[in-house]
């Protein structure tokens, strides 16, 4: 197995508005998440979130404590949320064993233990996407499925944004220090998410897009309300959203995305909305 990581530094909005396409993609887009028998991570300076993925194909992959953590184990001072977006898989955390099927999630609290990822079938490997944030105390590990989620049905087919927001790793379902994660599924014929757009200066966010055909693409919108920019994305890619940025998208096909947040509070509804007509 191989572990790869990179550090992404935070940007001031006054600087970011001058970025060209290449710089925007380099600073905010995370293209390489799933590579066979690799664990790939981005250590972001936005609330020190780690965004990553593991794709075990015939090997057991270990979540290693990368150097920026300066810790004996990855979870020594961190909590994490994991989603399986591939075939059936297994996550082991110390002596605990969790089987995760497609679109099932797992919360792991902080503590010194080894975490491993494996697939049940190498011909249909599991794909583990994860977010991790710093934690001030330990909370119990827990597997969470859509049956456990707080579900909000939003939008309409007429508005091209009919979707179910599955709030899964949130404080309405289980205790966390600062991590919140969920999964939004767009209905066939709907392509817009998070519109009207909002920001939440108390929390940063990361979006991971999947379930979109290879010949289609997602156009993710970011930036300040009056200085928006776009990032064209494919499936199985993620994008960082600073606390000062909107985070919305339209695509050429319906899709699903996993959102993860961390920062000042655990209030999902703490959002500052903008009128669609105010976007520039």
Swiss-Prot record:
Protein name: 4-deoxy-L-threo-5-hexosulose-uronate ketol-isomerase 1
One biological process term in Gene Ontology: D-galacturonate catabolic process
Keyword Cytoplasm: no
Biological role: Catalyzes the isomerization of 5-dehydro-4-deoxy-D-glucuronate to 3-deoxy-D-glycero-2,5-hexodiulosonate.
Residues annotated to bind Zn(2+): 198, 200, 205, 247
Family: Belongs to the KduI family.
Catalytic activity: 5-dehydro-4-deoxy-D-glucuronate = 3-deoxy-D-glycero-2,5-hexodiulosonate
Upper classification of the organism: Bacteria, Pseudomonadati, Bacteroidota, Bacteroidia, Bacteroidales
